[in-house]
C-alpha cells in the first residue's frame, strides 16, 4: 500500500449509486491507497429484492464477499446447487465465474473486496449449464 488508510463510522458516506438500485455503497478507501489495485466497499440493502440479479460476471481478478448481517444465496456456473452465505460467512469467488444472486435478506450488509477497484459487469443472455 502507498499510504495508511483509516475510516471511522463518522466518515461513512453512503452513496446510492452502484451496481444495484436496491442498495447503497460506502467506499472503504483501499482504491485510493493502492492506486486502484484493490477496491473495498461496504454494501447494505435499502429495500426488498424484487427479482434475482440475472446471470452475469465481473471483469476482475479477485472477488471476496464477507456477510456482516443477513444472508444471500448465489448460483455459480460449474457449482451444483445453491450457495447460501449468512452473517459471519465469507466467499472467495474465482475470477470471471458467471453467477446469479437468487435471494437475499432485506437486512443484508456485506463487505466486498475486489481486484482491481474498477471493473466491468457483464450480463449473460442465457444461463450457463446446468442452469439452462
Segments predicted by a language model, with ranges:
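Short acidic-glycine-tyrosine-enriched beta hairpin
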Residues: 78-96
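A short, N-terminal "cap"/entry segment at the start of jelly-roll beta-barrel domains
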Residues: 1-47, 121-132
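A short hydrophobic beta-strand segment most commonly corresponding to one strand
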Residues: 38-41, 92, 105-122
